[in-house]
From Swiss-Prot:
It holds the Pfam family Peripla_BP_4. InterPro entries: Bact_Solute-Bind_Prot2 (IPR050555), LsrB (IPR030159), Peripla_BP_I (IPR028082), SBP_2_dom (IPR025997). It comes from the Bacteria. Keywords: Periplasm, Signal. GO terms for cellular component: ATP-binding cassette (ABC) transporter complex; outer membrane-bounded periplasmic space. GO terms for molecular function: carbohydrate binding. Its main location: periplasm. Residues 1-26 form the signal peptide. This is Autoinducer 2-binding protein LsrB. Part of the ABC transporter complex LsrABCD involved in autoinducer 2 (AI-2) import. Binds AI-2 and delivers it to the LsrC and LsrD permeases.
Amino acid sequence: MTLHRFKKIALLSALGIAAISMNVQAAERIAFIPKLVGVGFFTSGGNGAQQAGKELSVDVTYDGPTEPSVSGQVQLINNFVNQGYNAIIVSAVSPDGLCPALKRAMQRGVRVLTWDSDTKPECRSYYINQGTPAQLGGMLVDMAARQVNKDKAKVAFFYSSPTVTDQNQWVKEAKAKIAKEHPGWEIVTTQFGYNDATKSLQTAEGILKAYSDLDAIIAPDANALPAAAQAAENLKNDKVAIVGFSTPNVMRPYVERGTVKEFGLWDVVQQGKISVYVADVLLKKGSMKTGDKLDIQGVGQVEVSPNSVQGYDYEADGNGIVLLPERVIFNKENIGKYDF
């Protein structure tokens, strides 16, 4: 081999390696942030997001704080922005606490979306939403009403915190529906477990001890619902109806033992997957508008809705809500079909 030919081959090899390196660096990087790590609901959402990343050949990083806090999420957001991530998808612990960090991210060209729990709409582009407050609040009340078969009843609400966006919107709608459709129901207390399993169990036991004649606990939170079920078992209370939102894998033993007759949720794996697909469209095409539809492998078709479906007044180009296609009520007959 001549020296000239050797140099030519070496140069082409170097160029090829450089091209591969550039392609690797150019791959989209998307951060998918839960309220906190270590909770099955959020882990399942992260699994869906990372599955979508593999299907789309994009790099999806799942990471969150160990406790649900604004400061913890802000630190992660800032870190991902500084590392050059192209998009951030976050389940917000506060409707406004993340806004300064998210607005700075958008100013630097990062696509910002929310999933599960929204910020103020001006602080993100799209919210991947499990259901409108009216849909989910109504679902909670209807599940309770199927078990509380009397005009006068005592009901407790129990969920994560007084500031979290999504759950407070659902509870507001649920309480309004109770006032309208079940005026004899008395809401005796509203309490919080703050996304902590131990505190949630203690709080649930406290509710059942303080209100021994309670008819229903409505717990729209992945920690609060199993805590309420466990508290009822610990206290041997089989009279109270326990409904709410959590994952089927967590709730399966309580359903099989009859402690919980039915509960609801949505396919959070699909929610994570949809979130990444929408982010990928934004990174490739720039924006979506109200009415645009997107076909997603293994999910079906989703559509961009205006912010008004969530009760917001704010509307802007490149801003809206993508609703999940359906929600699910789990019971003893169908829970075996689900694994997340």
